[in-house]
């Protein structure tokens, strides 16, 4: 680290603590904001402060929100009969960007009795008819799906999970064997 530049070094360290940012990138970012574009630096600092102060989990689904209920849970145009279970609020952002789903969400970031009771209350309150699991494909996810399906089997729900397979533009040699196996077993007719 640069001697005599404590504030700069602290900024570099803060950037380097972020996911996917290495030390070289952290130095470039810090230099850019301190020297090349101080206005962007001040705007970034302000935006970070506001985001930390005002963004919180939605009281119903766990999505990112600036209000008690997020825009999705408040939207009367959404299909309120289907509920997509995700692992993280980031997953909601990704699914919303895809414009492939118009129902509600529930963030299941950990499997405990409190979360399961909250999920059950939402299912009953909103008269949910289908749970869609959009979880990372793994043995743990399969166990979670099986557990929830078993726990809520008396609630007259349809259970489904998102399809698995080969991403667009990826060569077969670069696909893991589990994904390749599932893609073959769950192939569709054309």
UniProtKB/Swiss-Prot annotation:
Recorded GO MF terms: DNA binding; zinc ion binding
Q: Where are the zinc fingers (C4-type)?
A: 58-73
What InterPro entries would the database entry show? DNA_Rcmb_RecR (IPR000093), Rcmb_RecR (IPR023627), Rcmb_RecR_Znf (IPR015967), TOPRIM_dom (IPR006171), TOPRIM_RecR (IPR034137)
Q: Which GO terms describe its biological process?
A: DNA recombination; DNA repair
Spell out the Pfam families in the cross-references: RecR_HhH (PF21176), RecR_ZnF (PF02132), Toprim_4 (PF13662)
Q: Which residues form the Toprim domain?
A: 81-167
Does the record bear Zinc in its keywords?
Answer: yes
- State if Signal is listed as a keyword: no
Keyword annotations of the record: DNA damage, DNA recombination, DNA repair, Metal-binding, Zinc, Zinc-finger
Q: What does this protein do?
A: May play a role in DNA repair. It seems to be involved in an RecBC-independent recombinational process of DNA repair. It may act with RecF and RecO.
Family note: Belongs to the RecR family.
Protein name (database record): Recombination protein RecR
What's the source species for this entry? Campylobacter jejuni subsp. jejuni serotype O:6 (strain 81116 / NCTC 11828)
């Amino acid at each position: 680290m640069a001697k005599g530049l404590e504030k700069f070094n602290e900024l570099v360290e803060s950037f380097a603590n972020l996911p996917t940012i290495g030390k070289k990138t952290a130095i470039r970012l810090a230099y850019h904001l301190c020297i090349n574009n101080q206005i962007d630096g001040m705007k970034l600092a302000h935006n970070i402060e506001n985001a930390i102060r005002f963004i919180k989990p939605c009281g119903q689904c766990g999505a990112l929100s600036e209000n008690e209920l997020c825009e999705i849970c408040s939207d009367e145009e959404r299909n309120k009969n289907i509920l997509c279970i995700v692992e993280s609020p980031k997953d909601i952002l990704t699914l919303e960007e895809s414009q492939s789903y118009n129902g509600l969400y529930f963030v299941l970031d950990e499997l405990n009795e409190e979360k399961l009771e909250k999920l059950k209350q939402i299912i009953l309150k909103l008269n949910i008819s289908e749970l869609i699991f959009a979880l990372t494909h793994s043995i743990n996810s399969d166990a979670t799906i099986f557990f929830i399906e078993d726990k809520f089997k008396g609630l007259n729900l349809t259970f489904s999970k998102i399809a698995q397979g080969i991403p667009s533009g990826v060569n077969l040699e670069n696909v893991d064997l589990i994904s390749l196996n599932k893609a073959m077993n769950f192939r569709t007719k054309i």
